[in-house]
Amino acid sequence: MNKNVMVKGLTALTILTSLGFAENISNQPHSIAKAEKNVKEITDATKAPYNSVVAFAGGTGVVVGKNTIVTNKHIAKSNDIFKNRVAAHYSSKGKGGGNYDVKDIVEYPGKEDLAIVHVHETSTEGLNFNKNVSYTKFAEGAKAKDRISVIGYPKGAQTKYKMFESTGTINHISGTFIEFDAYAQPGNSGSPVLNSKHELIGILYAGSGKDESEKNFGVYFTPQLKEFIQNNIEK
């Protein structure tokens, strides 16, 4: 297995006024490869597992507990230039769960592209975060050939922050590294990787290659990573 994944810069961070994101063009290290293209738009994201997914300006995150979101380090950092705001389960036709200001960020101390984002409980519209989202449960484990889904906001502002779900298969797991063939694009960084029970296996962080035969990559949640996340869920 080659772990030297080429993560390419992008210019995918632009404006969506309804999310309160400022316009900006910036190279961000979250290029996503094409793979198995079983993709559908989620027009109503008010029910689980979709209402646990949040939009950052340049990526995606997933709610795991009270006021607590998991995403990539590079997404949490890049969100600084967008007034530190996230949108709960925004979709093209369904009712969103509000826009929330970020309270703080806790980065995983290891090499893994993993960060915890805490948000203020009350949205800019006066909504309660925890009453408008669901918490995604952790999977006990996963293995090669398991079916998975990836939910997020590919191409972000270019698609007006429509939510999409793609499905595929796990190819390989090694330590905290997971490879799979579910289709993804820029903006899917931080997207939850879920098993068939909608339990959280990990989060997507990168891709490699130029055609649909190439694969995508994620941070696999080992017991150690799950312990880090659980210890940082707001009480």
Curated annotation (Swiss-Prot):
GO biological process: proteolysis
Cellular compartments annotated: Secreted
GO MF annotation: an example: serine-type endopeptidase activity
Enzyme Commission no: 3.4.21.-
Domain of life: Bacteria
Main location: secreted
Family: Belongs to the peptidase S1B family.
Protein name: Serine protease SplA
Gene: splA
